[in-house]
Amino acid sequence: MPGPTPSGTNVGSSGRSPSKAVAARAAGSTVRQRKNASCGTRSAGRTTSAGTGGMWRFYTEDSPGLKVGPVPVLVMSLLFIAAVFMLHIWGKYTRS
């Protein structure tokens, strides 16, 4: 190549190893990583969950969707477990 590229990066023309080239560029680089990135997402997550009610909106009257109480959920889950149990026993006897 006749001279340095306008962007200042040399791709494949350097005699140095890539790790040394990256280390040399990183040492003099003006681009910095944001230090408050993790704190910002945590505080943003906290404010959004506190502002909208978070999980508690699931149990309020204004939440969209089907309203099912805890007793029907318990009954349906026990019926599902019983049905799986009966199918398991029925499959054992019809197989042998």
Swiss-Prot record:
Alphabetically ordered keywords of this record: Acetylation, Endoplasmic reticulum, Lipoprotein, Membrane, Palmitate, Phosphoprotein, Protein transport, Translocation, Transmembrane, Transmembrane helix, Transport
Membrane topology reported for the UniProt record: Single-pass membrane protein
Superkingdom, natural source: Eukaryota
Positions of modified residues (Phosphoserine): S7, S13, S14, S17
N-acetylproline sites (modified residues): P2
Principal subcellular localisation of the protein: endoplasmic reticulum
A Pfam family annotated for this UniProt entry: Sec61_beta
InterPro entries recorded: Sec61-beta/Sbh, SecG/Sec61-beta/Sbh
Cytoplasmic side: 2-70
Covalent lipid adducts (S-palmitoyl cysteine), residues: C39
Modified positions (Phosphothreonine) in chain numbering: T9
Transmembrane annotation, as ranges: 71-91
Biased composition (Polar residues): 1-17
GO terms, molecular function: epidermal growth factor binding; ribosome binding
Stretches assigned to coiled coil: none
Residue spans of biased composition, Low complexity class: 40-50
Subunit and interaction comment: The SEC61 channel-forming translocon complex consists of channel-forming core components SEC61A1, SEC61B and SEC61G and different auxiliary components such as SEC62 and SEC63. The SEC61 channel associates with the multi-pass translocon (MPT) complex. Interacts with TRAM1.
Name of the featured protein: Protein transport protein Sec61 subunit beta
Organism: Mus musculus (Mouse)
